[in-house]
Amino acid sequence: MTQAIHAQNISYPNSLKGNVSDTYFGKEIKDPYRWLEDDLSEETKAWVLEQNKVAFGHLEKIPFRQDIVRRLTAMWNYERISAPFKKGKNTYFYKNNGLQNQSVLYKKTKKGEEVFLDPNTFSKDGTTSLAGLNFSKSGKFCAYQISVAGSDWRKVILIDTKTKAILEDTLIDVKFSGISWFKDEGFYYSSYDRPKGSELSEKTDQHKLYYHKLGTKQKDDVLIFGGNDAQKRRYVSGSVSKDMKYLFISAANSTSGNELYFKDLSKKDSPIVAIVANFENDHYILDTRKGKFYIVTNKNAPNKKIVITDAANPNPENWKDFIAETNQVLSPSTGSGFIFAHYMIDAVSAVKQYDYNGKLVREIKLPGVGTASGFGGEDKDKELYFSFTNYVTPGTIYSFNPKTGENKIYQRPKVQF
């Protein structure tokens, strides 16, 4: 039956060949299908429509297609709940009833739970998705990003977490950006200048970091980094330390290797200071404590390590190893006043718990042989959460007591297989 389907002759629509070419280093390179790069043209839309007719016409002839649909639906149709996380006085978690296109964000209440944000209501056709979400320091405000039809150009919408009222501070044309709040006053975000042509094919190579103050217009946002040729970078991001004292800036021209800068937010008009001023390695700030920076780096450590340095002398020559490199790749997280070092050893998770003096507190006993992720949270959290799964265990959420090292099941999915 399958062979008969494959043996059918498929008549594909004609794809027009153009006469476009470029010359690089004296050699002509033909590009006959460049017209398809214009995703907004009527010609491209018509071409996609005809291609879809052929593809779906072929797929609809598969005799066992509905059997596959029924089996996959049965396997996917079970409730999934994420690990809870606290923001301010509220506790949130994501839940999917099994067949929802996007998980719904819930807030715990005295009576149980309530829907806080449902991405499935963003559009009637389901093509608008939740692309990011961040809460302000006290949890009073939430900024979330939406993406339409998978576009990297996003809109940032702000809401009051108590009333769920949408604020007037909606931002547009935000691309490749996180949101990092400074207290409840505003936040840092990144974007490019809006391209004049197609958003899918026009060049964007100068990322800029901005600060948006609540209650102001986007056009009045303050440019922090990336506004001149000396600061021209393809990717720029900003993150505020947990104590709200420092802004850290990562700048890169590719997906490997980045510069690292910081700005003291406790001092008015403080300069941007370089920590690393080259693209030779990857670095990011894990945490800060009492003027000390905890940096994750692969400088002289391909499997990554954590170093500690002083804000007064942050350059690499002053770095000291905090958690040294091992034979396994390091993936750290922080929570409850501890640092958790996650390693994969022969495809099996191993997690170690350290205090901020670098002392090993314990090697965490996991529920079994498998993959664990999580252990992140705020310093004041008295319990943390992690997920665990293996070949015979669907993703299960555990609560973890950082003082005793004990863990227990928080939520186990009920599957039908």
Regions found by a protein language model. Name each.
Residues 14, 28-417:
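Peripheral, non-catalytic segments that deliver or gate enzyme domains
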